[in-house]
Regions:
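"A position-specific structural signal for the A-helix of alpha-solenoid helical repeats
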Residues: 24, 55, 93-96, 126, ...
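Pre-active-site segment of Zn-dependent metallo-hydrolases
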Residues: 210-215, 219-262, 271-274, 283-301, ...
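C-terminal regulatory/interaction regions
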Residues: 174-176, 180, 184, 190, ...
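Metallo-beta-lactamase
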Residues: 184-199, 286-330, 337, 453-479
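Structural motif corresponding to the intra-repeat A-B loop/turn of tetratricopeptide repeats
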Residues: 32, 63, 101-103, 134
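Alpha-helical repeat scaffolds
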Residues: 3-12, 36-45, 66-81, 104-117, ...
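Catalytic core of the metallo-beta-lactamase
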Residues: 213-218, 222, 310-369
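Hard-cation-handling environments
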Residues: 397-512, 566
Length: 573
């Protein structure tokens, strides 16, 4: 493939917003083995081009997403080879598709394709499919050689192993939570949106179900003790909505809260702490520092700071702090509740980030006692096609480089806590290598300075600056290639809001959404109305949550008696 073809295709798409070149661009990226980027771009406009649906299916296959790939395959079944012919799909990719999906010799066109490229090892391997049983085929040296380049091919040929998994619909609330998504009244809610998730042997778990964004509060209690895990707030259209914790406790006939444990320093997990002023409040030192910096209206009374792996004893109930990889200072809680083991994950991530290490699952598996209740987040539980955080990070850097190459300014609305520093570090090496410069502004600038000092890590400097308050807004826009600004949700009056007010009328602007923004946010609506005109817009999820595959695999590894999916919309079974 000609290098000039790639340059022209990238310019047309990333600079001129011309989607007609996407079929060619995805072909080029797939051949360059940029499978995550291929999938991402193909997914954007799959309804406009059948060839993009083909590359979405093929990239999912190579990435090992077998079920998602087969779901697309079944949409056109035996017609895929005709689609390849109609859209002139690159021959090598046609053969690879035929290998993954075990195609037969349906047409003269396909047979001629095989004949023309018989010197290719892909073709030679395909020719052997009908000569060997599947058991012998996967033992061929040529098959294993091809699998070195395409490891996921083995998954498509190996029979599914039956496993005696303890995770069944009878033991797991998957089915309940799946239904809950579609019909709000499938599980009873009281007037304060509290939901009884568990009631057995005198132990009860109630969880708050928020209006839109998932604010967390989970009450675990028995006849002798009540402990609350997280007490967050919701960002709603007209501001912040606090959880009515005191009223909820009164409705549940709870007179005393023995302790409150906060998993991490995001508003949806601590924003209603003022509702519980008398209870001892436990969190890590890093979480306490983050809350003090970002929320001056939160009063941390009765604060007790703990370190990773510390254990707190509350009336005979033991709660252990285990780092969980979401942001700096974040933890899950491993609870021994009078002989019952409960794990409350908070928000968690297995992948290492620049600013914190991922959850070490072995820290949970080495404890011999079986988990009775696994209370886990499910932010991405309804997105089985979702890629991993590392794959989205790769997509993010690739798109930034492509956009900047053609002279566009990039604005990245970002959460101040953790995400801004993480985004800056993702781009740091690329900025040095490609010569573009980055400005961090708003509360994100203060938090990035805090992260730099607390981590002793070089974030600021070189090609990355933080705004110090003495430079005109227009000057900042004109003299920086990338601007990272809070708030991540584009709230009116925020730093990111003011930047976009100025930038949306410019000719070459790219908005990169890397976290949650409410659909009704006026600025987001303005951005989307200009999309594919003067504004380029990409939505690349970089929040450090457990992806769908992780949610399933972690549950299977922990093998609890009961798994409850919270803080999201359940999980797609």
């Amino acid at each position: 493939m000609d290098v000039s073809d790639k340059w022209l295709a990238e310019k047309s798409f990333f600079c001129d917003n011309d989607i007609m070149v996407l079929p060619k661009l995805t072909e080029i990226y797939f051949e360059e083995k940029k499978y995550s980027l291929t999938y991402y771009l193909a997914d954007l406009y799959q309804n406009d081009f059948l060839s993009l649906l083909f590359y979405k299916m093929l990239s999912l296959s190579v990435l090992g997403k077998k079920k998602a790939a087969f779901k697309i395959y079944e949409s056109h079944g035996d017609d895929w080879l005709n689609i390849c012919k109609q859209y002139n799909i690159y021959w090598k990719h046609v053969i690879l598709f035929a290998l993954y999906f075990k195609q037969k010799r349906y047409s003269d066109w396909f047979q001629n394709l095989l004949n023309r490229h018989y010197d290719s090892e892909l073709v030679q391997l395909f020719e052997l499919i009908e000569e060997y049983s599947q058991e012998k085929f996967v033992q061929l040296p040529l098959f294993n050689k091809i699998c070195e380049e395409y490891p996921s091919l083995k998954k498509f040929y190996m029979p599914l192993k039956s496993k005696n998994s303890p995770i069944t619909f009878e033991k797991v609330l998957w089915r309940v939570w799946g239904k809950y998504n579609h019909k709000l009244r499938d599980m009873p809610l009281d007037k304060n949106k509290m939901q009884c998730l568990y009631n057995k042997d005198g132990l009860k778990i109630f969880s708050y179900k928020p209006h839109q964004v998932a604010a967390s509060m989970h009450i675990i209690f028995d006849h002798d003790a009540t402990i609350i895990f997280d007490c967050g707030a919701e960002l709603v259209e007209d501001g912040i909505k606090h959880i009515p914790a005191r009223q909820i406790l009164e409705d549940l006939n709870i007179n005393k809260v023995d302790a409150v444990f906060i998993s991490h320093g995001h508003l949806d997990h601590y924003g209603s702490l003022n509702e519980l002023p008398r209870s001892p409040c436990f969190m890590t030192e890093e979480t306490a520092s983050i809350i003090k910096m970002t929320s001056t209206n939160i009063f941390l009374r009765n604060l007790q700071v703990k370190n990773f792996y510390d254990t707190v004893n509350v009336g005979g109930i033991k709660i252990k702090f285990i780092p969980n990889g979401h942001i700096r200072g974040s933890v899950l809680f491993d609870i021994d509740w009078r002989g019952k083991r409960i794990i409350y994950t908070g928000d968690y991530c297995l992948a290492d980030q620049h600013t914190c290490l991922g959850l070490d699952i072995n820290s949970l598996l080495t404890i011999p006692k079986r988990t009775d209740i696994f209370l886990t987040e499910s932010t991405y539980g309804k997105k089985p096609q979702m890629l991993s955080l590392k794959q989205y990070e790769s997509i993010f850097v690739d798109i930034c480089e492509a956009v900047i190459k053609f002279g566009k300014k990039i604005i990245i609305p970002s959460f101040a806590v953790g995400r801004a520093a993480e985004v800056a570090l993702l781009l740091k090496e690329s900025a040095r290598r490609n010569g573009f410069i980055i400005l961090i502004d708003g509360l994100a600038a203060q938090m990035t300075e805090y992260y730099q000092n607390s981590m002793e890590k070089n974030i600021i400097g070189g090609n990355i600056s933080v705004y110090t308050g003495d430079i005109d807004l227009r000057y900042r826009i004109d003299n920086y290639n990338v601007i990272i600004a809070s708030s991540g949700m584009l709230q009116e009056g925020s730093t990111s809001f003011f930047y976009l007010q100025e930038m949306l009328d410019m000719d070459k602007v790219c908005v990169l959404k890397v976290g949650f923004i409410r659909e009704y946010e006026d600025m987001l609506i303005s951005i989307l109305n200009r999309r594919d005109k003067n504004v380029t817009f990409f939505d690349i999820p970089l929040s450090a949550h457990a992806d769908y595959d992780t949610l399933i695999s972690i549950t299977e590894k922990i093998s609890p008696e009961t798994a409850i999916y919270i803080h999201g919309q359940g999980i797609e079974a």
